[in-house]
């Protein structure tokens, strides 16, 4: 082993070189202590804006100050108000000279930080909002520090790291190697990518090159689903298919949101062989109901359709032996959406999309500018999603998966499900409230025992938020206004669940009129 000290401009680099027999040596830079003297020469500093030069000379101190603010926030997130309902500050004019990073940090801490929600905390049960595990926060910080543009592989290992992470996630969700994947911003874009590939598949079946001729060349497209998320209709609008092309298929009776497979079969028969898109749901928003994926996939023996599965958070059922049966058949899908800033508990924004037809995906998203090059057998990520440029979103997920493994993330899922059942049992026992759907996984859907109007339900949600103890989101289920409490945060405990229940119980006479 050879240790040498080299200089890169004014910054020393300690390099450890390991001899590996006849192979080329492997060199790994070990960052030394930041130099006490400013790294910029006088000429360099003279050419740089004053505040930039000052921040560069004090970079370690600035990062330490930011670290201290973050550490205080994370240490107190359990007790800070879960939601802030007061008015935000008025806008200020754009600075001309700038204050420097330290002053900006102070201004943020004084002016804006107090009004940010406690959405990273354990009692933020609105929407389906995960927190950020300690390892994923560290990975997210380093994502910014290394500042990689992961869309292209040239000159960096960043794309290889993402491919490794996608492979781990594929294994985590029980998908076979036929599925390739890429990171995107969230479930909406993941669904959009999956449906874009489905649109290209329709063209393949109908003899139309959609990527060249446009969606209009397909004619009317049939999209069938039982209880789709609103992001599906948004995706259909973006893709030029049209929101109104989504055809609702009846669901099972008995307080269910899962599609009736017999009704789906009948709807496909009515198409007389015309290819279609079927959107199956692995975890509906209100009750976390699951379509019978295996039975839906079996319909492909008789009908021509692309099977897209929205498994934004329900896909995490695969992590638990107790609940994995709910996603049986997921591997048979042609494309799959999974959101990672929900139940994987990595910082916003992160999701992954999978598909069996990377060739069609590349046809849709390839960017063939001469300086970018043409797609290859293992195309760069800029050829797979709408983004040509993006950060290394995979790194926080890589950190969390490596730090806690599949067993650590399984524990989060199983604990959250147990806590959802605990809250559901408590709500069922509270006067004035009524459990409105069975607790199937991690969401509790409930409403008022009397007069569950939209106004009264919204008043309950606001009253709970005003206590600072919890945050819930209103919804409508089976035609009735209701509330949802979604458990997906790694921090949430029985004590947190009991505090949410106490906040509900503290409302006057159960509820405002």
Functional labels for PLM-detected ranges:
Residues 328-431:
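Active-site C-terminal subdomain of aminotransferase-like
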Residues 45-178, 499, 503-504:
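N-terminal entrance/gating region of PLP-dependent enzymes' catalytic architecture
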Residues 438, 443, 467-484:
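Conserved PLP cofactor-binding pocket of PLP-dependent enzymes
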Residues 44, 303, 477-513:
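PLP-dependent enzyme catalytic core of the Aspartate aminotransferase-like
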Residues 434-464:
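Conserved PLP-binding catalytic core of the aspartate aminotransferase-like
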Residues 190, 196-362:
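Conserved PLP-enzyme active-site core in the AAT-like
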Residues 169-196, 247-250:
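Short loop-beta-helix segment that forms the pyridoxal 5′-phosphate
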């Amino acid at each position: 082993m050879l240790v040498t000290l080299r200089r890169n401009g004014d910054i020393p680099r300690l390099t450890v070189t390991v001899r590996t027999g006849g192979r080329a040596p492997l060199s790994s830079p070990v960052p030394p202590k930041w130099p006490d003297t400013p790294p910029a020469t006088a000429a360099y500093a003279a050419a740089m804006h004053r505040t930039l030069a000052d921040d560069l000379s004090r970079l370690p101190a600035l990062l330490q100050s930011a670290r201290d603010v973050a550490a205080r926030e994370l240490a107190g997130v359990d007790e800070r108000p879960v939601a802030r309902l007061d008015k935000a500050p008025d806008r200020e004019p754009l600075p001309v000279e700038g204050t420097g990073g330290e002053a900006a940090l102070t201004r943020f801490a004084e002016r804006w930080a107090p009004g940010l929600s406690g959405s990273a905390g354990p009692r933020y049960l609105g929407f389906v909002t995960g927190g950020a595990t300690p390892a994923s926060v560290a990975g997210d910080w380093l994502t910014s520090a290394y500042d990689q543009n992961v869309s292209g592989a040239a000159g960096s290992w960043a794309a290889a790291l993402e491919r490794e992470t996608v492979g781990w996630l594929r294994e985590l969700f029980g998908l076979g190697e036929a599925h390739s994947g890429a990171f995107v911003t969230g479930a909406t874009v993941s669904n959009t990518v999956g449906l874009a590939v489905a649109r290209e598949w329709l063209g393949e079946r109908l003899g139309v090159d959609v990527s060249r001729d446009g969606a209009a060349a397909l004619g009317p497209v049939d999209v069938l689903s039982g209880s789709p998320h609103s992001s599906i209709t948004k995706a259909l609008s973006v893709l030029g298919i049209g929101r109104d092309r989504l055809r609702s298929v009846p669901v099972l009776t008995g307080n269910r949101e899962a599609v009736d497979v017999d009704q789906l079969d009948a709807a496909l028969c009515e198409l007389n062989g015309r290819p279609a898109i079927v959107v199956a749901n692995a975890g509906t928003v209100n009750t976390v109901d699951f379509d019978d994926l295996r039975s839906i996939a079996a319909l492909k023996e008789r009908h021509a359709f692309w099977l897209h599965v929205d498994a934004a958070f329900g896909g995490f059922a695969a992590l638990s032996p107790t609940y994995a049966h709910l996603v049986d058949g997921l591997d048979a899908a042609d494309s799959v959406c999974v959101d990672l800033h929900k139940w994987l508990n990595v910082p916003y924004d992160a999701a992954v999309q999978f598909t069996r037809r990377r060739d069609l995906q590349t046809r849709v998203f390839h960017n063939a500018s001469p300086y970018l090059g043409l797609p290859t057998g293992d195309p760069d990520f800029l050829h797979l999603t709408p983004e040509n440029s993006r950060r290394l979103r995979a790194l926080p997920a890589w950190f969390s998966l490596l730090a806690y493994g599949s067993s650590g993330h399984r524990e989060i899922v199983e604990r959250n499900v147990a806590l959802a059942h605990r809250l559901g049992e408590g709500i069922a026992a509270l006067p004035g409230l009524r459990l409105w759907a069975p607790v199937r996984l991690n969401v509790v859907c409930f409403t008022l025992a009397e007069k569950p109007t939209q106004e009264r339900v919204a008043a309950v949600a606001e009253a709970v938020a005003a206590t600072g103890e919890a945050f819930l989101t209103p919804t409508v289920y089976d035609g009735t206004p209701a509330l949802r409490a979604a458990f997906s945060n790694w921090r949430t405990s029985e004590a947190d669940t009991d505090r949410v229940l106490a906040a509900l119980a503290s409302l006057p006479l159960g509820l405002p009129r």
